[in-house]
A protein has these predicted regions:
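Acetyl-CoA-dependent GNAT
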Residues: 5-77, 82, 95, 101, ...
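Conserved acetyl-CoA-binding loop-helix of GNAT-fold acetyltransferases
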Residues: 81, 87-100, 126, 130
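Conserved beta-strand-loop-alpha-helix junction that forms the acyl-donor binding cleft
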Residues: 86, 111-124, 142-145
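Conserved GNAT acetyl-CoA-binding A-motif
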Residues: 95, 102-116
Length: 145
């Protein structure tokens, strides 16, 4: 597995993976509009987005971040791992890469917004605290980098 900066050539495979990941969690599969144009919604704004690619050149995970304007804080966005690839360290590797890039850009606080109802976000509610995040208000967690 390798983690790379988003490339348009993987766009459709990423979208397919995200829809599968949502379906596996029992959510109605729908695509987040920002993922339809990662370049405009992340790179053109000075933010970042990564893909996890397997040995068959398929997308098995993704995630990115967007800086909160005029602060040293950023939000982690769209951290997904293909359902059949979970519990193999892919999400942790993506988060580590995201946080490393944040630090390089002078970001000191990483935040994440959890969806609702909370029961549908049980994996996120367990994942982020294992990586040093703590809830600071309902549905939000943060970590000092």
């Amino acid at each position: 597995m390798k983690i790379i900066e988003f490339s348009e050539s993987y766009r459709d495979d990423m979208i397919f993976m995200v829809l599968q990941a949502k379906d596996a969690l029992g959510r109605k599969p729908s695509i987040n509009p920002d993922l339809l144009d990662v370049k405009a919604n992340y790179f053109d704004r000075g933010d970042m987005f990564f893909l996890a690619i397997d040995e068959n050149d398929r997308v098995i995970g993704c995630g990115g971040f967007s800086r909160i304007r005029d602060t040293n804080e950023a939000f982690v966005h769209r951290l997904y791992v293909k359902a059949s690839e979970k519990r193999r360290g892919i999400g942790s590797a993506l988060l580590e890469r995201i946080e490393s890039e944040m630090k390089e850009r002078g970001i000191a606080v990483s935040k994440v917004h959890l969806g609702e109802p909370r029961e549908q976000w049980f994996e996120s509610c367990a994942f982020y605290p294992k990586h040093g995040y703590a809830e600071f208000e309902p549905r939000y967690m943060k970590k000092e980098l």
